[in-house]
Every structure is written in structure tokens, then in C-alpha cells.
Amino acid sequence: MKFGKRLKRQIEESLPEWRDHFLNYKELKRRLNAVSSPDPAAEARFLALLHAEVDKFNAFFLEQEEDFVIRQRELQERIQSSSSAAAEMEGRVRREVVDLHGEMVLLLNYSSINYTGLAKILKKYDKRTGGVLRLPVIAGVLRQPFYATDLLSSLVRDCEAIMDAVFPSLPSPSAAAAAAARAAAEQAIFRNTVAALLTMQEVRSGSSTYGHFSLPPMTPLPDSDWLIQSVQPPPPPPPSSPLIIPT
């Protein structure tokens, strides 16, 4: 699948309030198609749009990350202060934990797919114009807040630890997370999370070579494999052996 279609699909599957914050790949391609040779004025306009897109990513990413930190802290405090909470409260906390975990995974995907879009459009620009924009621009992008996902990945793991805490009767974090997600399987956030995980896998498997512009390996999320498998159809059964009738 071409990247433009993959990005369009991912935007459609994202949370409605997130959709305006993704890369405007279509407009960047339109600007690119208007340039056929090195042109300082056209390059300046292209770079201005590119930098505006990066600023948009940074503002949205940092806002969401800060919100996640606050929500996770509040959840931890509620769990610690209500060890004998009513069943209704426990159910609400569990749903909030699942939603928070899902939104964090969506933000990891947001970082991944927007970076990939920038790298691809810059590669197209250099190929079309014979320029050398990609290397210096990507070097700057690698230092941008939206690309720095260490804190976010840590929050995901902390959230998985909270899942374990709110499902004390289950034998393992994976089982706890599985039960939480099954309870939320009809929610849009669940489907969006699975779509994000699949997209991250697709993006990283799109190239067999490693280079300066490659995404870092996807940090494994301990409970993501079963999440993906839970909505994928089972593999077809092996073909049966032909019936041999003795003569």
C-alpha cells in the first residue's frame, strides 16, 4: 500500500479530535509537484510548510503527553486510596486504564507515521529537484519533541503495571490486560489501538535496509501481540491429505 493511502486510512481510523494534527501529506505533494528543478523561492515555500507541520506535531504531541502524565498519576492515586472500592468504581477505573493505554499507543503511532511521511516527502523532493534537503532536515527532525518517545514508552509500561494492579485476581499482566481489553472490545479506542499497532508494524517492515532515515525499532509492548491477534482471523487450516483408496 502506498504511503499516502496508508496515512489516509490511519487518519480515518484515529480519534476524531486528532485528525487535523497529522501530516498534510497531500498539500506537501502538491507543493512538490509544482517544482521541477532547484528554485530557491519554491524551496523556501516548501520548507516553510514543512516546518509549520513539525511545529504542529510538537505542539500536539507535548499536549497529549502532558495529559497522559496527569491522567496516569490521578489513576494511580485513585487506586492507592480506594483498595476496597465498590464494583462500579473498579469497573470505571479499569475502563479508564484501558482507554489511557490505547491512547498512548495511538500517540506512539502518531509519532511514527508523521516522521515516516516527512522522510518520504523529502526523499521525493530531492529526487525531483536534484537537491539535498533530506539529510539536514531529517537531522533536525530527530531532535524534535514529537520524535522523542522515551517518556511515552515508559508511560505505556507504567500503564501496563497499573493494569496488573486493577486485576489482582488474574495471574499475569498479560492476562490482566487481555481481560481489560476484552471488556472494551466494542469501544472505538480498542479498534483504533489495534489499527495503530498494525500500522506501526507495516511502516517499519516497509524497508529491508537500515539507514539514517529509518525509524528506530519499535520498542516491544509486552501486551501488544495478543491485542493484534485478537482481531485478526485465524490462519486457514492446512489442506487435508488426499484420500487414497487402496486397489
UniProtKB/Swiss-Prot annotation:
PROSITE patterns: SPX (PS51382). It is found in: Nucleus; Cytoplasm. Predominantly expressed in roots. Expressed in root epidermis, exodermis and the sclerenchymal layer. Under Pi starvation, also detected in mesophyll and phloem in the vascular bundles. Residues 232-241 have a biased composition (Pro residues). Pfam families: SPX. Its main location: nucleus. Residues 1-139 form the SPX domain. Induction: Up-regulated under phosphate starvation. Down-regulated by SPX1 and SPX3. Up-regulated during cold stress. GO terms for cellular component: cytoplasm; nucleus. This is SPX domain-containing protein 5.
